[in-house]
């Protein structure tokens, strides 16, 4: 595969995998799958806000803000290709998760959440997309830290 297209393949591969996994788990949740354990429960909640239900006062208008942010990020990444080439998998994961949550907003009126961590403390209910967004941000930060360290080592 040509080097110039490899990053696009990685981006869309990560995008599709994260989107499909998140929607599959959400479909199981909507079909009634429930599970309880000492640490984590699989339940159902419809989040009309963003993280920790913030901005829920925007109600149905939040989906348009969400859509605008995703479109702006897509345009920026494909216009400024260096960032996309460097972090293609992470941005694919992030945008696949974001589009999956956006689809929920248009279809269900909010984001379908299902995981409830309750060992030691009660954490907000979250979904696969939320986890993937956090992992993608961590990947970008780790790559940037190591890139900076390599650059600093070369300067010594």
UniProtKB/Swiss-Prot annotation:
**Which protein, by its recorded name, is this?**
Lipoprotein signal peptidase
List UniProt keywords, sorted A-Z: Aspartyl protease, Cell inner membrane, Cell membrane, Hydrolase, Membrane, Protease, Transmembrane, Transmembrane helix
Task: Look up the record and name the pathway of this protein.
Answer: Protein modification; lipoprotein biosynthesis (signal peptide cleavage)
Q: Which family does it belong to?
A: Belongs to the peptidase A8 family.
Q: What does this protein do?
A: This protein specifically catalyzes the removal of signal peptides from prolipoproteins.
State its location(s). Cell inner membrane
Spans through the membrane: 5-25, 64-84, 89-109, 122-142
